[in-house]
């Protein structure tokens, strides 16, 4: 049995939610010794680039979460003049065609777009033969999430779920990984038609926030749907829409023929927020 197989098996045994809550406490504590130690060790381990952060002094952050969701200096991420830009720093995990309502995850693995978007067939219908992109944010990356194009918020769906780690080993070893983990589904209307933007949680992710609701994950373990069709929450391309308090993944879904990803954007391509992707 190889190392990756053992790692995946361990994911089923670890108390995922309890561990994530414990890490969440450390990430939110304002006790100087704890938060400064935590921040400095993390920044050194992952070689975090603080030169681009508005606050460069590690001890000036009130807690680890503030460091992890740090704001960047003006101009650090220019927004490309393109149909779509990357919503986050990270790397493309997978992208391409949604085949018969399923998105490719890894060799021999895929997941249902209906399940990804909370189990509602009507919500998923526009995307069943569309395009998707899965973008993984590594620990050292900038962890605010921005709009890939201008959009008007129509609906959000909090979907409770597991908290498997998200990495190549679990992508290859856990069936339907992204449709199993806790996630926040955000449905927008855009100039390209409907867009689903899914923020996926993972083990030790202390929370997911949106700019219109604050922290939305974790919530009580039942699905929650919010209707915004009467509201006027409009966000421009490149505007912040949310953030991760520790890790994970953003998935974009578009209808058939709505967008065409650039040829140079492929699996494992590194991305910077604001970079042209379509």
Place the predicted regions along the sequence by residue:
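Contiguous, well-folded functional domains in the mature portion of proteins
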Residues: 1-278
